[in-house]
């Protein structure tokens, strides 16, 4: 059976009912959207068909009418089939959406199966103990000294009482100390984790601020260097352009001067040639010779001036070339320095960007911290979460889920602690009750022994009946049986083992009874826990639907987007179901049937609804019924136990007295003793 329950639990875990419900929610939402779209498309098709009938001639309409009717019939059949499929899907969806997950119940059932298996093991162990008890009884049968056995048993009972008390006290103290230590350790760990997270977050914020400041500083420096570099490069380029223009002008002037010098040289050569011709012609007049001399001297002066100007221009060109090379070298060195600085800044910027990427989750951590602060501390501190990317509705849903999980864990821990405390209390009450019962049993045995010992021994031939009136009735019956006509022995147990067997059997019976009560209490507690969780789940579902209604109201304002979360879709479908006219019609029908009931039926139904709807009323009714049953069982058990104890005590006293008579009056006459008792 445990294997079947375990396999069923594994099957339901693999089945994942919650995931199926979410998928059904999404499918229901898509189905509703498709219904709206199909309605709109159908309306458009009807309008288009009407326009077609209006705009087309009658002959064409008659020809197309059968085709349109066949199309319309097919469309109606398809729509009918889709509606039937959607109705079937919605019925399946309505039945499956509120089905609770049976995995926790199966787990509880599996645990109960394990406990039942343990109970069977305990029963087998009990059988073994009974066998050992029988062996002990056989061994105890060899003991004949009754007084020594009684004293030893009394000493053992006292030792057992002391050990039980000490064990119960030590177990209770150990459990209490262990629970306190566990709570203290958990609280300390929680505080340490909170402090460590806050310190790490502060360090991360500080590092991020320093990195941001360093990044901004490097960016400003890099921007300044780029601007300076651009300005210097533009200035150098302008200066180089000016020098180049000056150099070009100087080159042009040098070329012009060279051309003029060449022309002058040509003129000079022509003048020399003319002088040579003039020297050959000696017959020329003196005026012409003077003119030629003057012309020659003026040309020589102009040639010298041009040569000086050419030399000066060449010097200017050389000086400009030297300054240009020097300027190029300076600009190249400055450009290399600026490039080195730019590379250094770029490397620093890359390092800072890598550090920033390494701490890229700062915003997420900060957002989570603000969300936790807004949910954990005062409402005024949660104003920072309004700037986060998540909307308020998602935060509320997440908070609701976290509170549900925390409530479940606290409830489980509370149930565990209460169960442990109840077990310890039960152990303590069992120990005290067992000690009291053993004391009462010892007192009864001592009283019976004193009663038996106080009886005077009758004479062999006869005695008065005054002392015999004090003998209990069970002893008389045992003696009558002992001295009856059959003369058979009525004692089946040894002499000194009756009280020990009685105490052992009674203690064993009490142990079984308490174990059975513990198992019944655990079963009832598990059922009560399941019912409480189911009711709490229903209340949480109703609260979530109300919360979704508020979210829907908030989303109705302009500028608010509608989320597409699975949880919102599921609660949206439940909210739409609440607005369903069929459900309202069914509610009205139920109200009409309720009004048609008799007053007695109304009172009974109202009382049942009141008890089932209110948690306090359910608890009171449950405990009241449990108290009545326990009271009846306790009274019946007390009556049965008292009768059993009386019978056992009477039988014990009778057997002891019969053994005593059999031992000490064996030589007496049986007939005389029979007459005496008569």
UniProtKB/Swiss-Prot annotation:
Residue intervals annotated with topology Lumenal: 641-678
UniProt GO cellular component terms: cytoplasm; Golgi membrane; neuron projection; nucleus
Coiled-coil residues: 16-40, 67-374, 427-454, 502-556
GO molecular function, one term: chromatin binding
Organism this protein belongs to: Mus musculus
KW Nuclease (keyword) present: no
Cytoplasmic topological domain: 1-619
Major subcellular location class: Golgi
Taxonomy, superkingdom: Eukaryota
Name this protein carries in UniProt: Protein CASP
Keywords: Coiled coil, Disulfide bond, Golgi apparatus, Membrane, Phosphoprotein, Transmembrane, Transmembrane helix, Transport
Keyword set includes Phosphoprotein: yes
Gene3D superfamilies noted in UniProt: 1.20.5.1700
Family note: Belongs to the CASP family.
Tissues/organs with expression: Ubiquitously expressed.
Role played: May be involved in intra-Golgi retrograde transport.
Membrane topology: Single-pass type IV membrane protein
Stretch forming the signal peptide: none
Subcellular location: Golgi apparatus membrane
Transmembrane parts of this sequence: 620-640
Modified residues (Phosphoserine): 586
Subunit structure: Homodimer; disulfide-linked. Interacts with GOLGA5.
Any Pfam family the entry gives: CUX1_N
A GO biological-process term: kidney development
């Amino acid at each position: 059976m445990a294997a079947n329950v375990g396999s069923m639990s594994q099957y339901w875990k693999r089945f994942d009912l919650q995931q199926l419900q979410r998928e059904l929610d999404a499918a229901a939402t898509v189905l509703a959207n498709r219904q709206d779209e199909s309605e709109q498309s159908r309306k458009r098709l009807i309008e288009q068909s009407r326009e077609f009938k209006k705009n087309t001639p009658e002959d064409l309409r008659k020809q197309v009418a059968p085709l349109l009717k066949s199309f319309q019939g097919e469309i109606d059949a398809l729509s009918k089939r889709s509606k039937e499929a959607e109705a079937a899907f919605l019925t399946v969806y309505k039945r499956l959406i509120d089905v609770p997950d049976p995995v926790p119940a199966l787990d509880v059932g599996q645990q109960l199966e394990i406990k039942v298996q343990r109970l069977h093991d305990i029963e087998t162990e009990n059988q073994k103990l009974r066998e050992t008890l029988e062996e002990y009884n056989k061994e105890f049968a060899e003991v004949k000294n009754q007084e020594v056995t009684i004293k030893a048993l009394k000493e053992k009972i006292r030792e057992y009482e002391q050990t039980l008390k000490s064990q119960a006290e030590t177990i209770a103290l150990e459990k209490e100390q262990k629970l306190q230590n566990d709570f203290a350790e958990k609280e300390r760990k929680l505080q340490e984790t909170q402090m460590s997270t806050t310190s790490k977050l502060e360090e991360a914020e500080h590092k991020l601020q320093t990195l941001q400041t360093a990044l901004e500083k490097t960016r400003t420096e890099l921007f300044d260097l780029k601007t300076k570099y651009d300005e210097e490069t533009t200035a150098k380029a302008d200066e180089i352009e000016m020098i180049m223009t000056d150099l070009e002008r100087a080159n042009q002037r040098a070329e012009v001067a060279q051309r003029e010098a060449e022309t002058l040289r040509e003129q000079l050569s022509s003048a020399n040639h003319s002088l040579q011709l003039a020297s050959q012609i000696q017959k020329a007049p003196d005026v012409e010779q003077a003119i030629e001399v003057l012309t020659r001297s003026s040309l020589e002066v102009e040639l010298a001036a041009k040569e000086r100007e050419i030399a000066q221009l060449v010097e200017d060109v050389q000086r400009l070339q030297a300054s240009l090379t020097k300027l190029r070298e300076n600009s190249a060195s400055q450009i290399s320095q600026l490039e080195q600085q730019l590379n250094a800044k770029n490397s620093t910027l890359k390092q800072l960007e890598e550090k920033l990427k390494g701490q890229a989750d700062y915003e997420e951590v900060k957002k989570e911290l603000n969300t936790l602060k807004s949910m954990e501390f005062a409402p005024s501190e949660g104003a920072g979460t309004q700037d986060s990317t998540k909307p308020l509705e998602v935060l509320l849903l997440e908070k609701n889920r976290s509170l549900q999980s925390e409530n479940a864990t606290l409830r489980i821990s509370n149930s565990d602690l209460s169960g442990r405390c109840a077990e310890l209390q039960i152990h303590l009450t069992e120990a005290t009750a067992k000690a009291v019962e053993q004391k009462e049993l010892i007192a009864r045995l001592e009283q019976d022994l004193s009663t038996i010992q106080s009886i005077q021994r009758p004479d062999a031939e006869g005695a008065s009946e005054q002392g015999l009136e004090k003998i209990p009735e069970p002893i008389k019956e045992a003696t009558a049986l002992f001295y009856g006509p059959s003369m058979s022995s009525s004692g089946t147990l040894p002499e000194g083992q009756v009280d020990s067997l009685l105490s052992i059997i009674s203690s064993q019976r009490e142990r079984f009874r308490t174990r059975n009560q513990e198992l019944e209490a655990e079963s009832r507690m598990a059922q009560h826990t399941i019912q409480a969780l189911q009711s709490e789940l229903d209340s949480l579902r109703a609260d979530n639907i109300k919360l979704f209604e508020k979210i829907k109201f908030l989303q109705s304002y302009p500028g608010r987007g509608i989320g597409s979360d699975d949880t919102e879709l599921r609660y949206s479908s439940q909210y739409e179901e609440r607005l369903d006219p069929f459900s309202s019609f069914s509610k009205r029908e139920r109200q009409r049937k309720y009004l048609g009931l008799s007053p007695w039926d109304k009172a009974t139904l109202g009382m049942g609804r009141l008890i089932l709807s209110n948690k306090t009323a359910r608890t009171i009714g449950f405990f009241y019924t449990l108290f009545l049953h326990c009271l009846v069982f306790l009274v019946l058990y007390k009556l049965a136990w008292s009768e059993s104890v009386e019978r056992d005590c009477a039988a014990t006293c009778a057997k002891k007295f019969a053994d005593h008579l059999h031992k000490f009056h064996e030589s007496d006459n049986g007939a005389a003793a029979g007459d005496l008792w008569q």
